[in-house]
Amino acid sequence: MLTLTPAERLWLQAYQSHLKTEFPGCVEEISIFGSKARGDARPDSDLDVLVVIREGDWHFKEALTRPGYDLAIGTDVVPSLHVYTSAEWAQLRAHASVFREVVERDRVPVS
């Protein structure tokens, strides 16, 4: 049960739009996970966002995440962006990552 505030919904729309415009074809998936996805968020909860991309190094990931944080400036939105390549995300599955298991259980795809 996805529980986003109006400000979080606006932020998410703006971030998705930015990624589609600036990085066309690079993003494979955007999902919300954690308390916002489970429906048990508190007023001070952050917005956990998983972004899976086709490929890219840490410089590219930084270029993807920085605008997300910039878009939150002056709002009540506190994004926590987690960017993985599809290969890295698959590797977490192969190694039975607890983080991946939690994300898989809770996540709500939004793109």
What are these regions (language model features)?
Residues 1-28, 38-43, 53-111:
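Catalytic core of pol beta-like nucleotidyltransferases
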Residues 48-51:
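Short beta-strand->loop micro-motif that forms the acidic, two-metal-ion catalytic signature
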